[in-house]
């Protein structure tokens, strides 16, 4: 059976290293499915889930919450470099829920302030940071609650 090697690397080191028969990722240009023999490519990733179907068991899928980064496909070797990445089994869903609630609260407060003071650009930065924090929390919750 044809296979690929998949590695997920963060500033904290190697987070994932397995052989796969299929990978699904979400890039800035949309969703991508990768099979062995895929053309070489480099693409920026969205904050989203990464699905890896393992070679050792076709029914086994590893889910990884990836917070942006890039994916490189070269000769059946897939490297994902991300600021952070967590496997579904490692995600503390209750912690992610709390992060989601904090981000939603900040977004609501900052959106009100921005509407009141539309000329302040620093408020827009706070809103953008809160939106990113919310996307990351939702991604972690989504991956952390996958049926195992």
UniProtKB/Swiss-Prot annotation:
Question: What family is it from?
Answer: Belongs to the ATPase epsilon chain family.
| GO CC terms, sorted | plasma membrane; proton-transporting ATP synthase complex
Q: Where does the sequence pass through the membrane?
A: none
Q: What does this protein do?
A: Produces ATP from ADP in the presence of a proton gradient across the membrane.
Stated name of the protein: ATP synthase epsilon chain
Q: Which NCBIfam families match?
A: ATP_synt_epsi, PRK00571.1-3
- Please give one Pfam family short name: ATP-synt_DE
Query: Which domain of life does this protein belong to?
Result: Bacteria
* An MF annotation (GO) of this entry: ATP binding
Answer yes or no on keyword Cell membrane: yes
Whether Ion transport counts among this entry's keywords is yes
Q: Which UniProt keywords apply?
A: ATP synthesis, Cell membrane, CF(1), Hydrogen ion transport, Ion transport, Membrane, Transport
Indicate where this protein resides in the cell.
Answer: Cell membrane
Membrane topology, record value: Peripheral membrane protein
Description of how the protein assembles with itself and partners? F-type ATPases have 2 components, CF(1) - the catalytic core - and CF(0) - the membrane proton channel. CF(1) has five subunits: alpha(3), beta(3), gamma(1), delta(1), epsilon(1). CF(0) has three main subunits: a, b and c.
């Amino acid at each position: 059976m044809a296979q690929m090697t998949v590695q997920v690397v963060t500033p904290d080191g190697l987070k994932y290293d397995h052989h796969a028969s299929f990978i699904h990722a979400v890039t800035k240009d949309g969703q991508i499915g990768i099979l062995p023999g895929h053309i070489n490519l480099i693409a920026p990733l969205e904050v989203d889930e990464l699905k890896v179907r393992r070679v050792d068991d076709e029914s086994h899928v590893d889910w990884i919450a990836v917070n942006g980064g890039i994916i490189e496909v070269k000769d059946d070797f897939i490297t994902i470099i991300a600021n952070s990445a967590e496997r579904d089994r490692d995600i503390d869903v209750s912690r992610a829920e709390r992060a989601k609630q904090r981000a939603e609260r900040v977004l609501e407060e900052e959106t009100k302030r921005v509407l009141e003071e539309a000329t302040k650009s620093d408020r827009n930065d706070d809103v953008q940071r809160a939106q990113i924090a919310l996307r990351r929390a939702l991604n972690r919750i989504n991956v952390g609650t996958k049926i195992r």
